[in-house]
Amino acid sequence: MAQQGQGSMDPAALDDIIRRLLDYRNPKPGTKQAMLNESEIRQLCIVSREIFLQQPNLLELEAPIKICGDIHGQYSDLLRLFEYGGFPPTANYLFLGDYVDRGKQSLETICLLLAYKIKYPENFFLLRGNHECASINRIYGFYDECKRRFSVRLWKVFTDSFNCLPVAAVIDDKILCMHGGLSPDLTNVEQIKNIKRPTDVPDSGLLCDLLWSDPSKDVKGWGMNDRGVSYTFGPDKVAEFLIKNDMDLICRAHQVVEDGYEFFADRQLVTIFSAPNYCGEFDNAGAMMSVDESLMCSFQILKPADRKPRFL
């Protein structure tokens, strides 16, 4: 039998990992270990990293495709998205980053996504979010979850994979997708191809902005960002970029929006956020955007759970 190299995975073993992940919907209280062992998770990281590097940093994709925003470890909501849209490979998917941190099940979330990436490399796509970065997920929960359930060593293996994620995608030359937004350093989409990987996310510059910037209706041109990182950009910058690059729409995530999706700049930009009841603190819906062959966009909504009254 052929030896499985670092860049491949036994198909039966991969299918078994996916089966266990789909079985493991709600862990019992006090369950320490996930349904996977550390060496299996490490293998998911190593093999997916190879695939990310084999594919371009600016993905060129075709419709029809379904696009999802932030998940943030809300594993049961990720499974709801697949129930709505169809489990891979019945539909093609693009995720816009922020798979880990804040939610309770970052490990299940990222493991299922990496497993699907390995199984369906030409039908399932993952972009990098600002939380797929060691300095951020060290603080906001993923490091602690890895350490508590497995080891710090495993967190470092995830970091190696995250440092190779692509940062943007273009759908049929007309829809530009990224996690955060535009950059004053970005005039031509082709520039994204020049970002070298593996790389950490720097504190400023093109890669930082693609993962961190936000649209703002109150700004003309470029403005300060309340996050303390990157910029905000006005509707004028969206229109200018689309005209210059002969595109129709910018699709991004990165911000909680009440209905799960929200248009900006005369529907030239859309924000998609896919974690309903974000952190248990918001009453937002989650959404998934379906792009059909003619590039018509429609939305599937995950309604927030009904809040239980605290006092009767």
Swiss-Prot record:
EC number of this enzyme: 3.1.3.16
GO cellular-component term (any): protein phosphatase type 1 complex
SUPFAM superfamilies: Metallo-dependent phosphatases
Cofactor detail note: Binds 2 manganese ions per subunit.
Cofactors named for this entry: Mn(2+)
N-acetylalanine modified-residue sites: 2
Main location: nucleus
Localization per record: Nucleus; Cytoplasm
Subunit and interaction comment: Interacts with SRK2D/SNRK2.2 and SRK2E/SNRK2.6.
Protein name: Serine/threonine-protein phosphatase PP1 isozyme 2
Organism name: Arabidopsis thaliana
Source species taxonomy: Eukaryota, Viridiplantae, Streptophyta, Embryophyta, Tracheophyta
